[in-house]
């Protein structure tokens, strides 16, 4: 059962939307909430632009003087703003939580902290990224691939209530994400639509059969759909996104890659396309 939720914060609108979702899930699951702001240690050093006589770049140099004061003041301001956002998010909610600040390499620190959590919640993209790029940020992609935990990716202003959509191809990632997906669906008491792409309907139904039994044993109402035919990666992503729009889905649960016997349905490009345009949070595991 999910008893520990890690919410990664960086001040972006997406991370604050993720915090709201993390608080809601912590309350519904009666789980502990750990809100974490990682101060990027790279903001407190300067990088030499030269190489030494052997052609190697010297180690970064810690900031000093006014530059250090400005960096520390900015970090303190961000910490204060995020703590205020955290307090607002938990106000009046039955949540056991803590707000922590650590300094380190962001991705490395979050991956390490994720090992003490049952669920990681973070925004689709972090602060400071080029607004013209719609896709998930590098920290989000790193967490999906390396956290070894289910990762809930939250867009800014997305739909957060409604049935759950599970694009199912039998791959390792989607098989692993089914367990936390079922727990979340049970907590929300929502139905689950399982969508499979197969060359023949019989292949898709055979692939779905064990999942039918699994959902039934957990009391989850499942709507099983098979789409026949061949499809491109972009077409597969459109299929998922179209189903999410049709269902007014509140969550998509999927694996990040496909290793199944049918044609590849969920690969890196499909993952990115869904994360970029999903109208709701996406729960992922590799």
Task: List the model feature ranges, each with a label.
Residues 15, 19-21, 26-28, 99, ...:
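Gly/Ser-rich helix-loop-strand patches that form or flank binding pockets
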Residues 35, 98-101, 153, 194, ...:
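A structural preference for short, hydrophobic beta-strand core positions in alpha/beta folds
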Residues 14, 40-43, 51, 67-120, ...:
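Structural beta-alpha unit
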Residues 1-65, 93, 146, 159-229, ...:
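Small/aliphatic-rich secondary-structure junction motif
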């Amino acid at each position: 059962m999910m008893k520990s939720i890690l919410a990664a914060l960086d001040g972006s609108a997406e991370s604050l939307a993720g915090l709201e979702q993390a608080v809601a899930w912590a309350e519904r699951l009666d789980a502990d909430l750990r809100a974490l702001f990682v101060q990027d240690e790279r903001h407190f050093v300067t990088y030499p632009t030269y190489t030494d006589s052997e052609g190697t770049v010297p180690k970064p140099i810690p900031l000093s003087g006014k530059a250090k004061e400005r960096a520390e003041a900015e970090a303190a301001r961000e910490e204060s703003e995020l703590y205020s956002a955290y307090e607002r998010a938990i106000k009046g909610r039955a949540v056991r939580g803590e707000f922590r600040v650590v300094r380190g390499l962001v991705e490395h620190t979050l991956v390490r902290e994720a090992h003490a959590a049952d669920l990681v919640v973070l925004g689709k993209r972090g602060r400071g990224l080029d607004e013209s790029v719609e896709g998930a940020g590098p920290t989000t992609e790193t967490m999906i691939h390396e956290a070894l935990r289910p990762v809930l990716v939250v867009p800014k202003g997305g739909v957060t209530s409604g049935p759950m959509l599970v694009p199912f191809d039998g791959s390792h990632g989607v098989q692993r994400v089914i367990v936390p997906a079922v727990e979340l669906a049970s907590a929300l008491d929502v139905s689950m639509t399982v969508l499979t792409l197969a060359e023949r309907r019989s292949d898709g139904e055979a692939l779905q059969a064990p999942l039918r039994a699994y959902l039934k044993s957990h009391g989850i109402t499942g709507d099983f759909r098979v789409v026949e035919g061949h499809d491109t990666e972009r077409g597969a992503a459109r299929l998922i996104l179209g189903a999410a729009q049709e269902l007014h889905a509140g969550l998509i649960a999927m694996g990040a890659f496909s290793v199944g016997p049918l044609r590849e349905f969920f690969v890196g490009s499909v993952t990115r396309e869904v994360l970029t345009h999903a109208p709701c949070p996406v729960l992922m595991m590799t």
